[in-house]
């Protein structure tokens, strides 16, 4: 059993409870928690004790309280906290994003099915999102392939549990991470279309180079602006070559 509750702890009659979270429809699981459907939202049930989560740099109540107040468009932030019977922070809800890139058959939508204009919109939103992270003293961390979701609006980012809070000078770190995210969109799409060992090595070197480049995103935006109706799949290989 995994009983959790949400609401005002001092007023038990007003608490919403989930007797066993593992009875909910599963969305997925990772090294730090389990994700389920709940009332039109996604709810993440956290692994480990609060102390161990803090030691591992995972989600803590302090981090939750910081991130839930950061207003973003593309980065999925937590909304409500759930607690155990002993009033320990144990789970949180967040907006549910339907990831069409993981669908099979007719419902599948690949990132390559979107347009340069969609990619540009995502970049502009992410730039604003990262400005909000900077203001809050938060640095994005531990971005991997599972962090990328693709709904009908193109790119969304999840897995904020290892984001770092209380950073005094986050701007440069976040710029590098924003570069990394945008470069990885291109990288993963090229991999999807096929890449031999030589090409893979070149792509990895390109990723390392772009992460610390101040010109990468401005140059990419200019290229995307010129051909907003071009399919990403049609021009993906030129994006890494010309930037």
Where are these regions (language model features)?
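Regulatory N- and C-terminal appendages and interdomain linkers associated
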Residues: 1-18, 55-59, 224-243
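ATP-binding glycine-rich loop module of kinase domains
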Residues: 7, 20-83, 110-116
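Conserved hydrophobic "DFG−1" position in protein kinase catalytic cores
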Residues: 37, 96, 149-151
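Protein kinase-like catalytic core scaffold
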Residues: 41, 92, 156-159
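Conserved structural core of kinase catalytic domains
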Residues: 73-122
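Amphipathic alpha-helical segments that line or abut small-molecule/effector binding pockets
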Residues: 117-131, 135
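Catalytic-loop of the protein kinase fold
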Residues: 130-150
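C-lobe/activation-segment region of protein kinase-like
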Residues: 151-243
């Amino acid at each position: 059993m995994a009983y959790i509750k949400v609401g005002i702890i001092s007023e038990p009659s007003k608490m919403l409870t989930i007797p066993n979270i593992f009875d909910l429809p599963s969305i997925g699981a990772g090294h730090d928690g389990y994700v389920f459907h709940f009332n039109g939202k996604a709810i993440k049930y956290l692994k480990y004790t609060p102390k161990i989560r803090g030691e591992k740099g995972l989600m803590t109540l302090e981090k939750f309280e910081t991130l839930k107040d950061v207003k973003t468009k593309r980065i999925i932030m937590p909304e409500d906290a759930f607690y155990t019977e002993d009033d320990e922070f144990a789970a949180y809800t967040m907006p549910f994003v339907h990831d069409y890139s993981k669908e099979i058959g007719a419902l599948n939508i690949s990132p390559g099915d979107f347009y340069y204009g969609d990619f540009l919109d995502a970049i502009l939103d992410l730039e604003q999102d990262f400005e909000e992270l900077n203001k809050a003293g938060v640095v994005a961390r531990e971005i991997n392939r599972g962090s990328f979701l693709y709904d009908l609006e193109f790119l969304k980012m999840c897995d904020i549990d290892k984001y770092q809070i209380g950073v005094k000078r986050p701007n440069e770190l976040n710029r590098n991470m924003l570069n990394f995210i945008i470069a990885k969109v291109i990288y993963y799409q090229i991999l999807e279309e096929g890449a031999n060992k030589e090409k893979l090595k070149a792509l990895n070197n390109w990723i390392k180079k772009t992460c610390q480049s101040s010109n990468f995103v401005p140059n990419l935006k200019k290229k995307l602006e010129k051909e907003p109706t071009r399919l990403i799949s049609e021009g993906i290989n030129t994006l890494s070559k010309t930037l």
